[in-house]
Each structure stands twice: as structure tokens, then as C-alpha cells.
């Protein structure tokens, strides 16, 4: 017999593990990421809706979730098990939009609150009442689960019937293959909340892929499972049952209890109740699991232990997916950093070669001071430096885009494209740098005797030409020394070089950081991987 040793330390470890799973982010579209996101959702659903609530309240009723494909007759089966219509059934698809939980009146308190399925708003329907609760009563049944207030767009309708034994609750879930995505998602969440998985299929669909995926998942978790082969024509009953049993055996599920419900007039359209005799074996099996202590312990304990043991495999898989996300984010980040680092080196090399002193700037320099004023020379040098930086940023962005196109993960962030505002930002930064250099020249001239002091704008023009002209403007340094003295010129050029370096680095760093901002906003960090493994390690020690 499977037994559970429920200690506070185990619950604390599970809660910590749950928080670590919730903190996982998988935003990058890597191969395997959709599966990892599904694993994360399933883990949260099982921890929030099943494992933690079950371990905290071992005495709570056994919850059997009725799941299956479209048209399998789940709602009709639930209605027939309880002896009256509690769940909407019919030929229109999808039928079960709002899941319905049915329990004995004495057990209603277990589900009126948010002990399980905390994200679903309760809609309480006492026995015999035909209308939904008023808004005021509905508000009273709202609670707060692990994720906060329940979603008002997702409801769990609760019915009580005295025909169900105490200690047993049935939950009619939406179709697992519903065309409505929200229904499929909800069906998966509800199944994760089950002590007993009741898989319903039909004679015409028992070999379909989706029901078998559910069966294999139950086997993977070692959950307590029962299958119902529904709506089987009488003339095919023996043959279909034999074939279905053979399929289960080949899948390693030969020991799973199987129940067969024949095709009956009441099955047509899903509007009637099946005779009690048609569902009596299943009813008796479920009731035994609720009322017999040993059978109950076996059913509940097997599912809980199965989920616990599955964490040893699923958590490392999730941690591996987190690591892959971080590795991809590092590759994307490195491509940006390397592109801008390369262009930064290229800009400095171009400055030393005198690339700024070209075109209009070179013409102005050659005409200075006879045909060109200091302001005109400064304007042309600033414009040339701005153009050099704009070309560097554009080249870096092209290199980044080329590298990112080879990365599947780059699909989560926009590829760098020409930014019409980048030129304006760079121009503003260069003008600010120019103003700082002008202030530097003014300060130096201010320390000189007024009679011999040159004009500050002339000093600034020669200084900028010397800083940006490279080999082509060697005369600028000599002329600057003639104007203010050798020592002052050296001191001024040293301070000016520091300003050039810092401002160029700042411009490129600003543009680089703007390219990294969308990636940084995804918050793909390495910490969650280590935290997942650490939380699993603590849990394993507490088991």
C-alpha cells in the first residue's frame, strides 16, 4: 500500500519549489521551449490544484476528474452517475464550457473555498436551485489562491447531490481536444487536480492520438487511472473491448480498470440519463475508493506519490530549458556587444587616421583662418564626427541583424533596423561634447594674461582639429602650442583626449544599450536554473 508521510518540512519544501517554478520565464522561441512552457504550466497546476492541497488535507474527499475527447459522453456519464442532470450535455460543440464539480452536501465546504483550483471563481448551486447565484452571493464565494484573486472569466460550478457517497467528488472537465484553446487549457488544469483520472473515450475514437497522450501522461505520473469505453454498439461490444484491452496492454496499461458502457437510446444527443445498471460498475468502483480506507489510501497515495516522484525528472528538464534560454540570451547579447566593440575600435582607428578631417571639414581646415572662421571649422568637424559615429552605429546594427538571423531565439526581439532618431541623438551628444571642449578652451584662456591671450574660439577650433584630425592635422597641435604655450597645449590636449574617449564610448554605449533593452526586458537570467535544482534537492531530502 502507498502511504504518505506528510510533514511540515515537506510542505515547506513543496511551497518553495512551487515558487521557483512560478518564477521561471521562457520567452525565447527555442526548439523545445513550447514543451518546457507546458511543463511549467502542468507543474504549477499539479502543485497548486492537487499536490499541496492534498498533502495539507489528506482527509479531503477523493476527486475524480472525468476527462476525454469531444463527444465521448462525459457529461452524460456524470449525470447518470449522480442520477440527475447536473452538467450540460448535447450535440453542439463545445458542450462543457464551465466545469461542474458534484459532491455530497456534507462535503460542500471542501470546494466552496479555494483549497483546490484557486484560479476559478466559484458559482455555487445548492441542490434544487435552478438559477445561478446573485452577484452578491457570487462575490462571497470568491477567494484567493496562489496566484491571487480568481479569474472572473473562468468559473467552477458546484452542485451537491445526496446520491453521491460522502468522500467522493466528480468533476466534469471540458474536452481535451476542444477547438477552443481556453477549454483545452482548462481541461489540462482540471485533470492535474485529480486524485483519480477517469478517461472516457468511445468505440469510434478509442485509438485517437489525444486520448492516448492523456493515458501515457497518467502512466508517466503513475496516477490512479480508470478508463471508460463509452457508446459501444451491442454487436461490437466484445470485439471493441478486446481490441481496446490489447492496445492498453501494449502501452503498459493492461492493469488499468476498464469499464464499458453500451450504446443506448439515452446516449443519443447527450440529453438523457443512462440506466443505473449501465454505470453501476463504475459507480461501485468509485464509491469503494471513497468509502474503503485501504482503497482510498491506495488511490490517493498512488497519485500523490507519483506526482512527487515525477518531479525528480521534470524539474531537471525544466532547469535544462531555463539554461538553454540563458545560453541563447548570452549569444544574442554577445553579438550586440561584439558588434559595438568592433565599431568602437574602428572609430578610434579612423580618428587616428584623420578620417574626420575629410570633405567639407578638410576644406574648412585648409581655409582656416583666412577663409574660414573658428565657428565654421568647429561646425564642420562636429558634423564630420557625427557622420562617422552614425556610420559606426549603422554598421554595428547590420552586423547584429546578420548574427541574430542565425539565432532562433532572436524571434522574441525585433531585429535592429535603421533608427531615424539615432542620428539626432548622436548629433546632440557631439554638440554637447563640442560645448565641453569650448568651455575647456575658455577656462585655459582665462588663466592667461589678457594682453597676450588668444581668442577662446580659435583655441577651441585648433584643439578640436588636433583631437579629431589625426595625422592630417599635425599642424593644429603646433599652432595651438604657439598660441597658448607648449605646456598648456599638452595639458589641454590630454584633457581633450579624455573627453573624446569618454564621449565616444558614451555614444556607442547608449546605442548599444538601446539595442539590448528589448532583450534585457525579457529578464532571461541564469539564477532560476540553480534555484530549481536547489529547491528539488531540498524536497528530495525532506522526502
Report each predicted region and the residues it spans:
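Non-catalytic alpha-helical scaffolds
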Residues: 1-84, 169-170, 187-188, 192-196, ...
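Globular "head" domains of long coiled-coil molecular machines
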Residues: 59-296
Amino acid at each position: 500500500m502507498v502511504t504518505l508521510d506528510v510533514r511540515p518540512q515537506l510542505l515547506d519544501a513543496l511551497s518553495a519549489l512551487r515558487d521557483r517554478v512560478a518564477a521561471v520565464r521562457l520567452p525565447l522561441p527555442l526548439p523545445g521551449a513550447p514543451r518546457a512552457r507546458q511543463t511549467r504550466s502542468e507543474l504549477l497546476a499539479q502543485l497548486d490544484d492537487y499536490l499541496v492541497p492534498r498533502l495539507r488535507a489528506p482527509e479531503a474527499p477523493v476527486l475524480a476528474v472525468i476527462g476525454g475527447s469531444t463527444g465521448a459522453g462525459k457529461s452524460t456519464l456524470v449525470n447518470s452517475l449522480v442520477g440527475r442532470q447536473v452538467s450540460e450535455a448535447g450535440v453542439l460543440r463545445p458542450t462543457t464550457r464551465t466545469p461542474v464539480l458534484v459532491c455530497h452536501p456534507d462535503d460542500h465546504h471542501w470546494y466552496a473555498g479555494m483549497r483546490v483550483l484557486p484560479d476559478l471563481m466559484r458559482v455555487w448551486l445548492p441542490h434544487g436551485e435552478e438559477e445561478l447565484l446573485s452577484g452578491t452571493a457570487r462575490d462571497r464565494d470568491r477567494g484567493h489562491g496562489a496566484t491571487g484573486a480568481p479569474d472572473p472569466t473562468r468559473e467552477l460550478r458546484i452542485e451537491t447531490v445526496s446520491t453521491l457517497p460522502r468522500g467522493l467528488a466528480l468533476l466534469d472537465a471540458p474536452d481535451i481536444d476542444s477547438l477552443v484553446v481556453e477549454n483545452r487549457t482548462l481541461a489540462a488544469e482540471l485533470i492535474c487536480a485529480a486524485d483519480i483520472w477517469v478517461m472516457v473515450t468511445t468505440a469510434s475514437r478509442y485509438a485517437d492520438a489525444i486520448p492516448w497522450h492523456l493515458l501515457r501522461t497518467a502512466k508517466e505520473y503513475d496516477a490512479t487511472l480508470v478508463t471508460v469505453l463509452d457508446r459501444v454498439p451491442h454487436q461490437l461490444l466484445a470485439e471493441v473491448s478486446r481490441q481496446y484491452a490489447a492496445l492498453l496492454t501494449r502501452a503498459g496499461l493492461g492493469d488499468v480498470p476498464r469499464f464499458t458502457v453500451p450504446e443506448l437510446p439515452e446516449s443519443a444527443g447527450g440529453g438523457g440519463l443512462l440506466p443505473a445498471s449501465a454505470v453501476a460498475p463504475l459507480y461501485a468502483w468509485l464509491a469503494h475508493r471513497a468509502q474503503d480506507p485501504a482503497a482510498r489510501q491506495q488511490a490517493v497515495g498512488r497519485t500523490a506519490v507519483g506526482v512527487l516522484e515525477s518531479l525528480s525528472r521534470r524539474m531537471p528538464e525544466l532547469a535544462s530549458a531555463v539554461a538553454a534560454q540563458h545560453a541563447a540570451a548570452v549569444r544574442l547579447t554577445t553579438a550586440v556587444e561584439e558588434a559595438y566593440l568592433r565599431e568602437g575600435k574602428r572609430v578610434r582607428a579612423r580618428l587616428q587616421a584623420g578620417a574626420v578631417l575629410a570633405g567639407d571639414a578638410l576644406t574648412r581646415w585648409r581655409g582656416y583662418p583666412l577663409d574660414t572662421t573658428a565657428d565654421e571649422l568647429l561646425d564642420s568637424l562636429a558634423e564630420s564626427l557625427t557622420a562617422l559615429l552614425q556610420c559606426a552605429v549603422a554598421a554595428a546594427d547590420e552586423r547584429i541583424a546578420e548574427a541574430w538571423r542565425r539565432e532562433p531565439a532572436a524571434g522574441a526581439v525585433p531585429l535592429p533596423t535603421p533608427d531615424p532618431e539615432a542620428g539626432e541623438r548622436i548629433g546632440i551628444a557631439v554638440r554637447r561634447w563640442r560645448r565641453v571642449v569650448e568651455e575647456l578652451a575658455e577656462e585655459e584662456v582665462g588663466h592667461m594674461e589678457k594682453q597676450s591671450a588668444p581668442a577662446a574660439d580659435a583655441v577651441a577650433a585648433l584643439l578640436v582639429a588636433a583631437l579629431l584630425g589625426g595625422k592630417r592635422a599635425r599642424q593644429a597641435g603646433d599652432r595651438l602650442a604657439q598660441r597658448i604655450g607648449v605646456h598648456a597645449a599638452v595639458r589641454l590636449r590630454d584633457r581633450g583626449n579624455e573627453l573624446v574617449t569618454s564621449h565616444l564610448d558614451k555614444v556607442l554605449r547608449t546605442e548599444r544599450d538601446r539595442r539590448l533593452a528589448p532583450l534585457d526586458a525579457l529578464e532571461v537570467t541564469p539564477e532560476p536554473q540553480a534555484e530549481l535544482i536547489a529547491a528539488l534537492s531540498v524536497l528530495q531530502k525532506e522526502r
